Curated annotation (Swiss-Prot):
Cited InterPro entries: Anti-sigma-factor_SerPK, Anti-sigma_F, HATPase_C_sf
Molecular function per GO: ATP binding; protein serine kinase activity; protein serine/threonine kinase activity; sigma factor antagonist activity
SMART domains: HATPase_c
Sorted UniProt keywords: ATP-binding, Kinase, Nucleotide-binding, Serine/threonine-protein kinase, Sporulation, Transferase
Top EC class, one word: transferase
SUPFAM superfamilies: ATPase domain of HSP90 chaperone/DNA topoisomerase II/histidine kinase
Described function: Binds to sigma F and blocks its ability to form an RNA polymerase holoenzyme (E-sigma F). Phosphorylates SpoIIAA on a serine residue. This phosphorylation may enable SpoIIAA to act as an anti-anti-sigma factor that counteracts SpoIIAB and thus releases sigma F from inhibition.
A Pfam family: HATPase_c_2
Kinase among keywords: yes
Family as reported in the entry's similarity comment: Belongs to the anti-sigma-factor family.
Organism from which the protein derives: Geobacillus kaustophilus (strain HTA426)
Catalytic activity: L-seryl-[protein] + ATP = O-phospho-L-seryl-[protein] + ADP + H(+); L-threonyl-[protein] + ATP = O-phospho-L-threonyl-[protein] + ADP + H(+)
UniProt GO BP: asexual sporulation; negative regulation of sporulation resulting in formation of a cellular spore; sporulation resulting in formation of a cellular spore
Protein name: Anti-sigma F factor
Amino acid sequence: MRNEMHLQFSARSENESFARVTVAAFVAQLDPTMDELTEIKTVVSEAVTNAIIHGYNNDPNGIVSISVIIEDGVVHLTVRDEGVGIPDIEEARQPLFTTKPELERSGMGFTIMENFMDEVIVESEVNKGTTVYLKKHIAKSKALCN
């Protein structure tokens, strides 16, 4: 059965945790493992942070949009901004590549997303924005605790 959620918020760093928790609460209906839930929360944090810091250059007037569709045990997550866009997506997806070397932890966002999700697609157009499509299958059988 299909279920979906849509969320929009100002591109402010304090909204990153709101996005992460909201998506996690929605995905919880699939009864994911703690690892699966942590991975989804981490990916949301990375994608939203990229939109805020890189897409909008910390301009709080920008809007970040998130859509989550759950269907047949698969989470389809979309994070979209209408910011500056990415001129070279392939380069941006390289580990440790960053346009902001002065920031701690820079350059690992896409690498983290690729490690935690089953599929990551990035579409971007300069001066129009970026959309990140993420997909994760949630395991159907859970380990039993004795």
